[in-house]
Amino acid sequence: MSYNLTDPYEIARYIKEAKKSTPIKAYIEGDLSNCDFTNIEKFNSGDLYILFGESEEILVIIENNKDKIKNCRIEQDRRKSAIPLLDMLKVNARIEPGAIIRDKVLIGENAVIMMGAVINIGAEIGEGTMVDMNAVVGARGKLGKNVHLGAGAVVAGVLEPPSSDPCTIEDNVLIGANAVILEGIKIGKGSVVAAGSIVTTDVPENVVVAGAPAKIIKEVDVKTKDKTKLLDDLRK
């Protein structure tokens, strides 16, 4: 079944209809030699087993063989998850530990995703763009090239409340820490959003906005460019 992931209602349908998954990892010491490991990934040496699979299948094995098991430890990081995480091995970018990136996200060359960043389904991160610590890019949020999304900043998604227009952050924009860009807003090329701002209307190119709600306070000048320049070394 195909889905139009540019439509918030289609994304919601995709999530609703997706098979929910509760994968676990089990470390087991015991005699499981007579068990059926169909649909379970098994590694073992003697009586030591590491099992990867869905919780209901592994837990059945543990329950049915509890008298043969000496020790058992289970690791779990999600429950009834609808969307898998992105396969980061296919991305030519720097992604630090603790970043959470869902599947069907596009990440450009030499982008940087810092610790604790969250990027939702359908988002696009441009070449050379940095998503700083604990920043959030909601569903279908679009960040252009060489954008800096500051720590704790939020680019709202299209899912809830549903919105047909995603947030669009154009090239060379700097968004300060803890700023919030509301649903459907467009930030023009080269503009700067001050830390803590709440942006409720579109922002034209090459201006500085600040406040809650954010308002234009000046045009980007040489001094502003010097204070907001990016470091290429962080993207190599």
Swiss-Prot record:
Q: Which GO terms describe its molecular function?
A: tetrahydrodipicolinate N-acetyltransferase activity
Q: Which domain of life is it from?
A: Bacteria
**Any one Pfam family match given in the protein's UniProt record, by short name:** Hexapep_2
Per the record, the pathway is:
Amino-acid biosynthesis; L-lysine biosynthesis via DAP pathway; LL-2,6-diaminopimelate from (S)-tetrahydrodipicolinate (acetylase route): step 1/3
The EC class name is transferase
Query: What CDD domains does the database record attribute to this sequence?
Result: LbH_THP_succinylT (cd03350)
The protein in question is named 2,3,4,5-tetrahydropyridine-2,6-dicarboxylate N-acetyltransferase
The EC number(s) this enzyme carries: 2.3.1.89
GO term, biological process aspect, one: diaminopimelate biosynthetic process
**NCBIfam families given for it?**
DapD_Ac
Q: Which reaction does it catalyse?
A: (S)-2,3,4,5-tetrahydrodipicolinate + acetyl-CoA + H2O = L-2-acetamido-6-oxoheptanedioate + CoA
Entry similarity comment: Belongs to the transferase hexapeptide repeat family. DapH subfamily.
Q: Which SUPFAM superfamilies match?
A: Trimeric LpxA-like enzymes
**Job description of the protein:** Catalyzes the transfer of an acetyl group from acetyl-CoA to tetrahydrodipicolinate.
- Look up keyword Coiled coil and say if it applies: no
Assigned keywords, A-Z: Acyltransferase, Amino-acid biosynthesis, Diaminopimelate biosynthesis, Lysine biosynthesis, Repeat, Transferase
Keyword Amino-acid biosynthesis attached: yes
